[in-house]
């Protein structure tokens, strides 16, 4: 259940930070999220750290939004039938490729200042949020949002990164 293989692509030298060893921090946080959603099979994914310009371009091309954002998730299994995937998930040797996250540390930092959450909390929030999207969670409908933000909040609290009060009470992003 603990196997999560993450490949990193760091176009902005985020991981070269002398103050923090981000790779184990990221891995442990995502393993906590994996455990919370009861994913038993091994998973693999990529995390790409990109500039504000690059994520703006991706956001415009794939989401039709002409602005930079903090995270974009490209789920491999998006739209696949749950019964189809269940056949694979029953195989203990199956490694599930869940997709790719694109994170923009510059936007995350700006959000952390704007929302007064601190960088680590905002980064953790964004990371878990993207990971849950890769695993099929969404927040378009209120009932979906309640489930997704409930999981997200629990994982972050247990990791020492509590949600902003607005997120706790309403299950919505403050972004």
From Swiss-Prot:
Cofactor(s) needed for function: Zn(2+)
Matching Pfam families: YbeY
Any one Gene Ontology cellular component term annotated for this protein: cytoplasm
Main EC class the enzyme belongs to: hydrolase
Co-factor remark: Binds 1 zinc ion.
Keywords: Cytoplasm, Endonuclease, Hydrolase, Metal-binding, Nuclease, Ribosome biogenesis, rRNA processing, Zinc
Keyword match rRNA processing: yes
Ranges in a coiled coil: none
Family under the similarity heading: Belongs to the endoribonuclease YbeY family.
Described function: Single strand-specific metallo-endoribonuclease involved in late-stage 70S ribosome quality control and in maturation of the 3' terminus of the 16S rRNA.
Protein name, as recorded: Endoribonuclease YbeY
Species assigned in the record: Lactobacillus gasseri (strain ATCC 33323 / DSM 20243 / BCRC 14619 / CIP 102991 / JCM 1131 / KCTC 3163 / NCIMB 11718 / NCTC 13722 / AM63)
């Amino acid at each position: 259940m603990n196997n999560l293989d993450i490949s990193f692509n760091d176009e902005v030298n985020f991981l070269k930070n002398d103050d923090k060893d981000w790779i184990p921090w990221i891995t442990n946080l995502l393993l906590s999220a994996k455990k919370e959603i009861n994913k038993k099979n091994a998973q693999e994914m990529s995390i790409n750290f990109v500039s504000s310009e690059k994520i703006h371009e991706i956001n415009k091309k794939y989401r039709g939004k002409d602005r930079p954002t903090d995270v974009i998730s490209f789920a491999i299994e998006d739209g696949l039938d749950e019964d189809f995937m269940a056949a694979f998930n029953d195989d203990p040797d199956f490694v599930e490729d869940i997709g790719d996250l694109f994170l923009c540390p510059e936007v995350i930092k700006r959000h952390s200042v704007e929302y007064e959450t601190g960088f680590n909390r905002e980064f953790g929030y964004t990371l878990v949020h993207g990971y849950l999207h890769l695993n099929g969670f969404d927040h378009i409908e209120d009932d979906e949002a309640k489930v997704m933000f409930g999981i997200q909040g629990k994982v972050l609290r247990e990791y020492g990164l509590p949600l902003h009060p607005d997120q706790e009470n309403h299950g919505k992003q403050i972004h």
